[in-house]
């Protein structure tokens, strides 16, 4: 049975697999494209499974953002070569869009979401592994929503909305949304650069905080200072520690004469509250 070249082309477009695989699948399925798609998906999954024990340590972070909802995802591959591939970039952007559209709050939710013409997102990722020849892995997802305010974000990279590190922030205010977005983007850029560990002092891990204070107290004790003086030194060093790891206490990257909290207060928009943030670093901890 002679295969229609248009059918072969359509099959390649739908599956991303090679010419010979598509032609063979159509021949075995008597020209039925739907059956051939199912057969090729099985082939693609089998090829992807062979790569499952390989390490995917490169990749991209992608962001999808609207006024009151934002999502960041990380899709990993094995090499920078594939990370710059158009098919990989298209897949990452599609996954971010699906995560945003479906309001996915976890990696598992996104993996089980529908991916048009293929099945699920996880099947699309496995298909990508087969097409690109490297293990692909959806490793992280950050989701933020703001009911009374805006979500702003920033991804540092060469392509709009794609890069190696990104941040989302939630700002609450009844004020001008466009101005809030601009304030939020500047803070998101600060977060990407300074990588804070917590929003406020109260949000710090208490065990880590206790350990840090114990170390500082031990250091100060060796100075043999009077108790009052020693306490002031400890408090001063703790304040310095907060400046390093707490977002609201950090010196604002665009003007180190003020803290991030001061920048928010000085904005033209009234009653602004930074209620939450997310930072996603390629290959970093969740």
Swiss-Prot record:
Principal subcellular localization: cytoplasm
Gene3D superfamilies: 1.10.286.20, DNA helicase RuvA subunit, C-terminal domain, Elongation factor Ts, dimerisation domain
Cell location: Cytoplasm
Domain of life: Bacteria
Record keywords: Cytoplasm, Elongation factor, Protein biosynthesis
Alphabetized InterPro entries for the sequence: EF-Ts_dimer_sf, Transl_elong_EFTs/EF1B, Transl_elong_EFTs/EF1B_dimer, Transl_elong_Ts_CS, UBA-like_sf
Pfam families, per database record: EF_TS (PF00889)
Entry annotated with the keyword Cytoplasm: yes
Transcription listed as a keyword: no
Family membership: Belongs to the EF-Ts family.
PANTHER family assigned to the protein according to its UniProt record, in alphabetical order: ELONGATION FACTOR TS (PTHR11741), ELONGATION FACTOR TS, MITOCHONDRIAL (PTHR11741:SF0)
Designated name of the protein: Elongation factor Ts
Record lineage: Bacteria, Pseudomonadati, Pseudomonadota, Alphaproteobacteria, Rickettsiales
Chain's gene name: tsf
